[in-house]
């Protein structure tokens, strides 16, 4: 060690514990265009000031540790440290605050969601000084966004591949999710695609189990795709789940799907992990495969209002890591999803530029520059009576996916698909004619029933089905008043 280094490291050094806010709370800081910005919902332990809690989050997710260390003198903390630059109380909550933290871009490896999350949502979430901590939103700067490939293809390329425009895409998850043989599974795929669906889907927990090995499933599903395409004249697809126990096995399954000539594969991106997902997304772009993403495990992370991570952050991370579709809730079905919050992260998935809008839970303006968009998938407890609302809420650039709402039709799988396709076409036509789907939706469906006995039967079966439970993760009561 040189004398100069020894002198620099020893000047002003004193071992011991000091308050985080002395170094990491900087309300005078002006954020840079290259900073990654984070909004944390912080619940300090009793007796911990919010400034100290916010500073602790900034410190423990960047350069800080619990004590002063002499090696601080060997680097430029002012250049590399995270900074808590603003704190505001959460309306209606006595002990919760939103802490805004800015991170210098040099803290993160280029093109790595894994590294970004290891810092920002790492050990700090177990910090004893905090009763709870939730990451509400991230601002990803263009300088960092440009280091990612993002979705393999994006919305427009997918529409061109499928030759389908001017309406939402229509899908179905094959049920029962577990237990079918590969041949019976392929039969269900064929019947649904022949009936008018664009896609069918492996359920997220269908991988390669004793009752149905992955290779057999891929072969029977490919046969179903080609047979239904020949009979309908439409391009069809089935989300073949390539998720596996190792990255090598996952890629092997994707390679086999490509060799079969199918258009799309699938991945469970949270249980599979971001490193695996990014690897698969790169393979899909290089080999012309679309990539459908399921979000299994998300509610473990995002459902509680005061701890974890909001799904809008997971959605942004997926757009960076890569996926052409991702499940995004339904608002009207059986799964959790506040309407305004859902619309907020749907825009973050699809649009190139999204303005800050606290009424929809968007804390920062997000510029995606040239990163392709992702189609949101509405799936979970939906049926034909929901079609007007889904068409109105999600618009054309979406996938509406009915599992039980197709396979539960009293006449069988193909009639279930017919019912959904007729309902969708009726809603799109009515919307294009200027009718209000939110007001006239039920009437539009009833009119279509006159021309489709399959739809009439579906409407009769599901006329009483409701999922009327309150949303747990709601927006804060006065969020709409925040600029």
From Swiss-Prot:
Entry binding sites for substrate: 123, 173, 177, 295, 327, 379
Protein name: Ribulose bisphosphate carboxylase large chain
Positions bearing Phosphothreonine: 330
Annotated family: Belongs to the RuBisCO large chain family. Type I subfamily.
One Pfam family this sequence matches: RuBisCO_large
InterPro entries: RuBisCO, RuBisCo_large_chain_AS, RuBisCO_lsu_C, RuBisCO_lsu_C_sf, RuBisCO_lsu_fd_N, RuBisCO_lsu_N_sf, RuBisCO_lsuI
Site feature: Transition state stabilizer: 334
Subunit field text: Heterohexadecamer of 8 large chains and 8 small chains; disulfide-linked. The disulfide link is formed within the large subunit homodimers.
Processing and modification events after translation: The disulfide bond which can form in the large chain dimeric partners within the hexadecamer appears to be associated with oxidative stress and protein turnover.
Species the sequence originates in: Aethionema cordifolium (Lebanon stonecress)
Cofactor descriptive note: Binds 1 Mg(2+) ion per subunit.
Native organism taxonomy: Eukaryota, Viridiplantae, Streptophyta, Embryophyta, Tracheophyta
Signal peptide segment: none
GO BP, sorted A to Z: photorespiration; reductive pentose-phosphate cycle
Reactions this protein catalyses: 2 (2R)-3-phosphoglycerate + 2 H(+) = D-ribulose 1,5-bisphosphate + CO2 + H2O; D-ribulose 1,5-bisphosphate + O2 = 2-phosphoglycolate + (2R)-3-phosphoglycerate + 2 H(+)
Record-linked PROSITE patterns: RUBISCO_LARGE
Gene Ontology CC: chloroplast
